Amino acid sequence: WSSFISTPEFYKSYEVEDKRISTTFVTEFTDINNGKQYVYDPDNIAEPSFPLCHFAKYLDPNDNQSTSAGDYSCNRKIIRYADVLLMQSEAYCEMNRIGDALAGINRVRARAGLNPIPSSISQTDLRKAIIQERTWEFAAEGHSLFDMKRQHCMAERLGRAVDDKYYSLPLPQDETDKNPNLKQHPLW
């Protein structure tokens, strides 16, 4: 019923008062076969009945049919207003227009029930805050890799060395074969 799972560390990275927790994660469920109630405890992942926290973003709470992984009865999100606001905040941050950048990210945070980011924040810290906010807001929506590539922060966020070539994509071989003026990226 859910092929997306979260690590306990990511689940616990949300602020306790963040309203997105209840719409992002399945934290409890009732087994339709025996009526038993299960509650997720990120501090007790050894519990075999509910050891992993599943993402709830693509689940229909009224759908109790067992389906194959990836077969969801609700629509996937392509773009959301929060994405527009956070992209705008990121652009303003890169122009060092901190006040303008804070407007968008703080709207997203307010909707999630969180306090605004203070206006005294540095550009570097705001850049990190925007990426973290995008991570929480778009969990399991496929944005993180592109965000980390764009901000060139894969090594920092993943906690390990990342070869520079992974910040770009190679050109398809058949395209470079067809066009001699098209040169492959030097790292590939």
What residues fall within each predicted segment?
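Long, intrinsically disordered, low-complexity segments
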Residues: 2, 71, 76, 109, ...
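Extended, hydrophobic/aromatic-rich amphipathic alpha-helical segments that build helical scaffolds
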Residues: 18, 75-107, 127-137
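Acidic, mature catalytic/reactive cores of soluble proteins
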Residues: 19-20, 29, 97, 147-150
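Acidic/polar loop patches that form or flank catalytic/metal-binding clefts of enzymes
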Residues: 21-22, 100, 116-119
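Flexible, polar/acidic helix-loop-strand segments at domain edges
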Residues: 9-81
